[in-house]
Structures are given as C-alpha cells and as structure tokens.
Amino acid sequence: MKLVRISSTWCVSCIVMGKLWRELKENYPDFEYVEYDYDLDEEAKIYEPGKILPVIIILKDDKEIKRIVGEKSKSELFKEVDEVL
C-alpha cells in the first residue's frame, strides 16, 4: 500500500499531523510513503486534494481506497488506516 500526504507549511493542522505521519511510518514500515507540498509540488494536483488540508490518500495497486481529510487525533488516524488493512 502507498500513503500520499498533501500538506503545506502555512497549514497549522498539517504541522500537527506531521508528528502522526512520522508515527505512521514507524508503525507501518511496509507501506510506501510519499509527501507533497500543496503549493510547491505540481504532482500533488493529480490527487485532487481539494481545499482542506492535510489530506492523506491511501492507495492499493495505484487505486485510491481511502481519503483522510483534515486534522485527526492519533486514534482516529490509526483506526482509519487499520480499516483498510
């Protein structure tokens, strides 16, 4: 599975979620992780992130299976990831 994170430096929720993103990487080391800056990375646009950041998109075989939008607590985030395992 692949997790794509789209965030921005001006987004407070993105900064808060950055710590949880690092924890995801530690707890799910077999996933592929990609990060894009909403303002700087043109590649982010292919995922159509919308206007609410951060966005974490979970892909399986290059198909989106889950989209997590906005700031989440650690338990909420891990629950959403666990649901697709």
Residue ranges and their predicted role:
Residues 29, 51, 63:
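Structured loop/turn residues at beta-strand edges in well-structured enzyme cores
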Residues 57-85:
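Non-catalytic, surface beta->alpha helical segment in thiol-disulfide oxidoreductase systems
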Residues 6-19:
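Conserved redox-active cysteine motifs that mediate thiol-disulfide chemistry
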Residues 19, 47, 74:
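Chalcogenol-based redox active-site neighborhoods
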Residues 1-2, 61:
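Preference for well-ordered, secondary-structure-rich cores of eukaryotic proteins
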Residues 47-57:
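Structural micro-motif
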Residues 3-4, 56:
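Hydrophobic beta-strand anchors of alpha/beta hydrolase catalytic cores
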Residues 5-6, 21, 25, 29-43:
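Thiol-based oxidoreductase modules, predominantly thioredoxin-like and allied folds used
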